[in-house]
């Protein structure tokens, strides 16, 4: 079982993004004139792990509660440890390794 730990740790070296956030990004891009993602965004998106497990999404949300209380922000369903927020197209920015959208904006 000890040999499985490095592989498990490696899987957490990727950023995460929720299925819902990907859908929001695609809706926003679809409303643009050309409806295409740029090459940099496609590269970043393929470097992230899409999560759809509600337990993982809840863990991402709960890990950000202390920041939420201080900044008037809420998580965008994406981490930004290694790759910047793709959800910037929907108004999100990286703060403490999680992408947030200011609820006051």
Swiss-Prot record:
GO biological process, one term: defense response
Record has Transmembrane helix as a keyword: no
SUPFAM superfamilies, per database record: Cyclotides (SSF57038)
InterPro entries: Cyclotide, Cyclotide_bracelet_CS, Cyclotide_sf
Signal peptide range: 1-9
Residues that make up the propeptide removed upon maturation: 10-71, 103-105
Keyword Disulfide bond: yes
Key words of the record: Disulfide bond, Knottin, Plant defense, Signal
Cyclopeptide (Gly-Asn), cross-linked positions: 72-102
Disulphide bonds in the chain: 76-92, 80-94, 85-99
Post-translational modification as stated in the protein's UniProt record: This is a cyclic peptide.
Pfam family, one: Cyclotide
Sequence similarity: Belongs to the cyclotide family. Bracelet subfamily.
Domain notes: The presence of a 'disulfide through disulfide knot' structurally defines this protein as a knottin.
Annotated function: Probably participates in a plant defense mechanism.
Protein name (record): Cyclotide vibi-J
């Amino acid at each position: 079982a000890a040999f499985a730990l490095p592989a498990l740790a490696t899987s957490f070296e990727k950023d995460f993004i929720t299925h819902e956030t990907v859908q929001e990004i695609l809706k926003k891009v679809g409303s643009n004139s050309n409806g295409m993602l740029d090459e940099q965004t496609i590269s970043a998106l393929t470097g992230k792990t899409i999560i759809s497990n509600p337990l993982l999404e809840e863990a991402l949300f709960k890990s950000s509660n202390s920041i939420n209380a201080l900044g008037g922000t809420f998580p965008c369903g994406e981490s930004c440890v290694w790759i910047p927020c793709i959800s910037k197209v929907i108004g999100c920015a990286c703060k403490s390794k999680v992408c947030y959208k200011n609820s006051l904006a």
